[in-house]
Swiss-Prot record:
Subunit (UniProt): Homodimer. Forms a heterotetramer with IscU, interacts with other sulfur acceptors.
GO cellular component term, pick one: L-cysteine desulfurase complex
Entry superkingdom: Bacteria
EC numbers on record: 2.8.1.7
Official protein name in the record: Cysteine desulfurase IscS
Gene Ontology terms, MF aspect: 2 iron, 2 sulfur cluster binding; cysteine desulfurase activity; metal ion binding; pyridoxal phosphate binding
Family classification: Belongs to the class-V pyridoxal-phosphate-dependent aminotransferase family. NifS/IscS subfamily.
Binding site for [2Fe-2S] cluster: C328
Organism: Shewanella baltica (strain OS155 / ATCC BAA-1091)
Primary location recorded for the protein, binned into one broad class: cytoplasm
Annotated InterPro entries: Aminotrans_V_dom, Aminotrans_V_PyrdxlP_BS, Cys_deSase_IscS, Cysteine_dSase, PyrdxlP-dep_Trfase, PyrdxlP-dep_Trfase_major, PyrdxlP-dep_Trfase_small
Amino acid sequence: MKLPIYLDYAATTPVDPRVAEKMFQCMTMDGIFGNPASRSHRYGWQAEEAVDIARNQIAELINADHREIVFTSGATESNNLAIKGVAHFYHKKGKHIITSKTEHKAVLDTCRQLEREGFEVTYLEPAANGIIPMERLETAMRDDTILVSIMHVNNEIGVIHDIDAIGELCRSKGIIFHMDAAQSAGKVPIDVQATKVDLISISGHKMYGPKGIGALYVRRKPRIRLEAQMHGGGHERGMRSGTLPTHQIVGLGEAAAIAKAEMASDDARIGALRDKLWNGIKHIEETYINGDAIERVSGSLNVSFNYVEGESLMMALKDLAVSSGSACTSASLEPSYVLRALGLNDEMAHSSIRFSIGRFTTEEEIDHAIEVITQSIDKLREMSPLWEMFKDGIDLNQVQWAHH
């Protein structure tokens, strides 16, 4: 067993060896290295064909038409292109956007930028289980609302939104629906023929593909228009200029094909490992699961260990590669804004750890993780005066702390 044990699949995934092998075939002189836009020779034609195959593989993952797939550098760019692209194209129709407080920073900061440009954004509060209630979404809708951006699966707590219901509501009001599927594509079934979603952001490195590549699904019927954010040679039907990185795209395509073929078996195995982990640690006193216990993606487990400081717990769990929030914001010592939005106090938010399990996690690793977590919590609580006070029946919320 290799230490530390990788339990941070929501931050990134290793490239599947089958994907890496396909990618390498598109990089060197004796491979398919050409520019897909080179129309005058075989090197270009071969690269174009490889890109077309990958585009179809990604389309098949979500049951879309291959012409609805636009390649980007990742989900952050896809989110920017979707949200800014819609806002700038449809601004004469309205300047109101709805999103939620628990979105990824790539959505929240894009919306903040649009606010500086004169757009109005409503940030919805989730319920205590992390899911946005439909009535809150409907109440926020106005005549000048042009876009709703709600994530499919949350990156910190793993809860799944009812995208069918959100899509129906948005379509009935004539509002465009964008969904950040960075954490769900390849893990949760998505069918754009059945779900009324207009724009979907997809990330390569969250589904065992390479970093630096993603896609944006843009619906053709009814047609969604976007204003380009990246200008140049007019690639991707003018929506996203830049030479297509054949090896990255082939990697994303292969990752999508594997995910589609193995989704059900992966989901069952990963879900069983997650349940094993939770069943192994839930007996620890003052341990709480964050987010809805049922409506969640199989690989995600966000747990608060009360009266233990999150950063010291991270240090104690040096055998486990885990996080105390999203990787994109873990450099800040602020408690997770997602957990704060669920109503957790600073102490509970600070004592939370995100465990995310994936394709290469083993039973042996989970057994070791349970042992390490149990021992670390016991050790840290022995040293904690707060734990001692709690065990003595003192209500810590009522304590008047002296200010120094």
